[in-house]
């Protein structure tokens, strides 16, 4: 049985990040993630609160992890014991953020000079070093394989292959929801048996989501750039996902 985290001492917290608190459970191979309403942007230089965000992100993540599992993508998802809580398999995380881009937006627009909203001929995969102190810098394959030696060539190829598979599945699903999957960030790790699994979350916090009808933004960019109607956008994503995936 999983204890209610509210009854645990602070010392029981395994890790607290910007969006989630990770607690141990009686099973050392399983952790409990409590999703927070806290919001951050620009590497935590901007902070705030989005009411209901924790429950939205946990529920959307649960639906999408289940979709991916059914499609043959191993993930760390186990169950959703409460609206803002998910049970995950404990992973040894790879210190890379894997970003998949279908449409030019954000930093890609700044780096290339291409107009935001430009549709790419095919999805591209980028890798960033997961290090807040360094600002999560963009890496190329040479940096990863020869400097950081974070993963080997076969592992890097598997990360890229898996990310593109996830993109194909989620893009098709979101299209059915009337949403365009612009870009998104993934994190991976290895379970106790050494199997690569998709970790972290899949939510409006780490996915750029625009409506198909009018490219209306439904993600954290609304908070990031003070666009207003942030809570409504998150709730709309949740409603569209549940309408397609089921309660």
From Swiss-Prot:
GO molecular function, one term: ATP binding
UniProt xrefs under Gene3D superfamilies: ATP-grasp fold, B domain, Phosphorylase Kinase, domain 1
Coiled-coil segments on the chain, per record: none
Name of the protein described by the UniProt record: Phosphoribosylaminoimidazole-succinocarboxamide synthase
Pathway(s) per entry: Purine metabolism; IMP biosynthesis via de novo pathway; 5-amino-1-(5-phospho-D-ribosyl)imidazole-4-carboxamide from 5-amino-1-(5-phospho-D-ribosyl)imidazole-4-carboxylate: step 1/2
Gene (UniProt): purC
EC number: 6.3.2.6
Top EC class of this enzyme: ligase
Catalysed reaction equations from the record: 5-amino-1-(5-phospho-D-ribosyl)imidazole-4-carboxylate + L-aspartate + ATP = (2S)-2-[5-amino-1-(5-phospho-beta-D-ribosyl)imidazole-4-carboxamido]succinate + ADP + phosphate + 2 H(+)
NCBIfam families: purC
InterPro entries the record matches: SAICAR_synt/ADE2_N, SAICAR_synt_PurC, SAICAR_synth, SAICAR_synthetase, SAICAR_synthetase_CS
Record keyword Nucleotide-binding present: yes
Family: Belongs to the SAICAR synthetase family.
One BP annotation, GO: 'de novo' IMP biosynthetic process
């Amino acid at each position: 049985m999983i204890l209610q985290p509210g009854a645990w001492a602070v010392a029981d917290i395994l890790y607290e990040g910007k969006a989630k608190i990770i607690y141990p459970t009686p099973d050392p191979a399983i952790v409990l993630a409590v999703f927070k309403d806290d919001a951050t942007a620009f590497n935590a230089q901007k902070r705030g609160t989005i009411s209901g965000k924790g429950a939205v992100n946990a529920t959307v993540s649960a639906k999408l992890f289940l979709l991916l599992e059914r499609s043959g993508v191993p993930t760390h998802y186990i169950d959703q014991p409460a609206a803002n809580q998910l049970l995950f398999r404990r992973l040894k995380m790879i210190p890379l953020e894997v970003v998949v881009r279908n449409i030019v937006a954000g930093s890609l627009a700044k780096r290339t000079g291409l107009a935001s909203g430009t549709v790419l001929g095919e999805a591209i995969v980028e890798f960033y070093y997961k290090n807040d102190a360094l600002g999560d810098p963009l890496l190329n394959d040479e940096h990863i394989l020869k400097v950081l030696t974070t993963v080997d060539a076969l592992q890097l190829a598997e990360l890229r292959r898996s990310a593109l598979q996830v993109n194909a599945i989620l893009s098709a699903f979101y299209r059915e929801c009337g949403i365009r999957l612009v870009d998104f960030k993934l994190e991976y790790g290895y379970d106790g048996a050494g199997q690569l699994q998709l970790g972290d979350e899949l939510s409006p916090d780490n996915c750029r989501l625009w409506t198909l009808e009018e490219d209306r933004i439904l993600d954290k960019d609304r908070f990031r750039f003070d666009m207003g109607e942030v809570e409504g956008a998150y709730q709309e994503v949740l409603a569209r996902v549940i309408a397609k995936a089921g309660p």
